[in-house]
């Protein structure tokens, strides 16, 4: 399983990269907004420069999302984003216009990530349109009392049934169990907030055992 970090924060990306477990990055307009403070002072060129800096840190796919609604606008913006760096993956929402844009990008050698996916039928359409990645949002489904991980299971089964090469990125991850369950289901990737990456490494018995070892070592050194 591959781990992406779901953030636009450069410090978090650097910290995750230092752990040796990072395979890529996903961003979206909301994550960008968290780091800029006043969005009115953050231009589109600033956004592109920020994506370029992320690409310098991580040698892997970096998803950058289009911020428009029509296929024509998505294609124009997506081509501009793809020109930033060879590792840029263009994120398109799973809408009718998004599918048109995904097909265009697929035919022209630009990698895509179909985002805001909440049903297996949407994921099936994404694969048929040629998306390289599909991002089911499990946490948001959990928020409305729907089993987000069941969606991941359905998508993995459908893709395996037909041999679709589209990789499943489990997104909107809220806690370590989302990651573990996704891995058990055979999802290709989990894109994880830095806070959850740290939680994956923590266990109270590890902390207790380490304290005991250190206490015993301190006695022996006396």
UniProtKB/Swiss-Prot annotation:
Q: Where is the signal peptide?
A: none
Cellular component, GO annotation: cytoplasm
Superkingdom of the organism of origin? Bacteria
GO terms for molecular function, please?
aldehyde-lyase activity; transaldolase activity
Report which reactions are catalysed by this protein: D-sedoheptulose 7-phosphate + D-glyceraldehyde 3-phosphate = D-erythrose 4-phosphate + beta-D-fructose 6-phosphate
- Organism classification, top ranks? Bacteria, Pseudomonadati, Chlorobiota, Chlorobiia, Chlorobiales
Keywords linked to the UniProt accession? Cytoplasm, Pentose shunt, Schiff base, Transferase
InterPro entries per the record?
Answer: Aldolase_TIM, TAL/FSA, Transaldolase_3B, Transaldolase_3B/F6P_aldolase, Transaldolase_AS, TSA/FSA_arc/bac
Q: What is its EC number?
A: 2.2.1.2
The entry assigns this protein to a family as follows: Belongs to the transaldolase family. Type 3B subfamily.
Q: What is this protein called?
A: Probable transaldolase
Q: What is its main location?
A: cytoplasm
Which residues of this protein are catalytic? 91
PROSITE patterns, sorted: TRANSALDOLASE_1
UniProt-listed Gene3D superfamilies:
Aldolase class I
Primary role: Transaldolase is important for the balance of metabolites in the pentose-phosphate pathway.
Q: Name one GO biological process term.
A: pentose-phosphate shunt
Q: Name one Pfam family in it.
A: TAL_FSA
Species this protein is from: Pelodictyon phaeoclathratiforme (strain DSM 5477 / BU-1)
Q: Where in the cell is it found?
A: Cytoplasm
Q: Which HAMAP family match?
A: Transaldolase_3b (MF_00494)
Q: What class of enzyme is it?
A: transferase
Pathway where it operates: Carbohydrate degradation; pentose phosphate pathway; D-glyceraldehyde 3-phosphate and beta-D-fructose 6-phosphate from D-ribose 5-phosphate and D-xylulose 5-phosphate (non-oxidative stage): step 2/3
């Amino acid at each position: 399983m591959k781990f992406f970090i779901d953030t636009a924060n450069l410090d978090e990306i650097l910290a995750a990269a230092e752990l040796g477990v990072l395979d890529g990055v996903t961003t979206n307009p909301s994550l960008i907004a968290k780091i800029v403070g006043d969005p009115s002072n953050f231009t589109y060129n600033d956004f592109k420069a920020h994506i370029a800096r992320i690409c310098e840190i991580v040698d892997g796919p970096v998803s950058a999302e289009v911020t428009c609604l029509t296929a024509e606008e998505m294609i124009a913006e997506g081509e501009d984003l793809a020109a930033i760096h060879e590792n840029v993956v263009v994120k398109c929402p799973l809408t009718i216009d998004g599918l048109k844009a995904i097909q265009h990008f697929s035919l022209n050698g630009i990698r895509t990530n179909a985002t805001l996916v909440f049903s297996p039928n949407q994921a099936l359409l994404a694969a048929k349109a040629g998306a390289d990645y599909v991002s089911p949002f499990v946490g948001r489904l959990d928020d409305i009392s729907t089993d987000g991980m069941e969606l991941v299971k359905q998508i993995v089964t459908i893709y395996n049934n037909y041999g679709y090469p589209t990789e499943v990125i489990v997104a909107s991850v809220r806690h370590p169990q989302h990651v573990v369950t996704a891995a058990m289901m055979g999802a290709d990737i989990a894109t994880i907030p830095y806070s959850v990456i740290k939680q994956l490494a923590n266990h109270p018995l590890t902390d207790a055992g380490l304290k005991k070892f250190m206490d015993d070592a301190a006695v022996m050194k006396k």
